[in-house]
Regions:
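Glycine-enriched, solvent-exposed interface loops adjoining structured elements
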Residues: 1-214
Length: 214
């Protein structure tokens, strides 16, 4: 998997930055922005097993960078023939004091030592960016992140040129236009992968309609 250092090199090459006009901090910030956009379109899916330490409807999770839960099983027992038989939808997820917190409104209240299994969408990461220890980006999506980050970096630099003396006529507008085009191509790609993503956002359970609505 590609590390931050490799991404920096590729972004600089895309910018044809032979004179080091783009600082590492600018490139990292540009990459950070496109990574966040990429996550919204194509999150990284992970699993987490939460052992209940205190019985109750409210359970605080330690799962990092949790965006949305796509599957929850309680009680979870991996020794069963079908450990996912007790899948639940009678819960809400909210952030309380910065921590993902579950609230179960059904009749089955989690008890001490029971296990809650969750599958969830999480933030995508790149090794060494913001201390991440793994790169989760698909290899075939790397090119488009480089394209988007190069576009972001160009627009950031163009904004700075507006405050500088001695710039060449038209340099700022040309750079801004180029950067915007690259970033627009990146956003178009995100629309494509959103359509490919299989992210269940609707519950399987339904309410019966009233007799007069049938």
């Amino acid at each position: 998997m590609t590390t931050l250092a490799a991404y920096r090199t590729r972004i600089q090459n895309s910018l044809d930055d032979t004179n080091s006009k783009y600082s590492t901090s600018v490139i990292d910030e540009a990459l950070r922005k496109v990574l966040n956009e990429y996550t919204r379109a194509n999150p990284n899916f992970k699993t987490h097993e939460h052992t209940v330490s205190a019985a109750g409807r409210v359970q605080t999770l330690s799962a990092a960078a949790l965006i949305v839960i796509t599957q929850l099983v309680h009680p979870y027992d991996d020794t069963l023939t079908d450990p996912f038989v007790y899948e639940r939808e009678d819960f809400t997820l909210s952030y309380m004091d910065g921590s993902p917190t579950l609230y179960f409104f059904g009749g089955d209240i989690p008890q001490v030592d029971e296990i809650i299994y969750i599958k969830y969408a999480a933030k995508q990461t790149i090794t060494d960016l913001d201390s991440a220890v793994a790169t989760t980006i698909r290899d075939d999506h790397e090119d488009i992140l480089v394209l988007g980050a190069a576009g972001q970096a160009a627009m950031m630099r163009a904004s700075g040129l507006n405050e500088q003396w001695g710039g060449r006529p038209g340099e700022m507008s040309a750079l801004m236009s180029w950067g915007n085009n690259q970033y627009s191509n990146f956003l178009s790609f995100l629309q494509e992968i959103k359509q490919e993503a299989n992210l269940p956002i609707f519950p399987d359970s339904i309410w019966q309609i009233d007799e007069w609505d049938k």
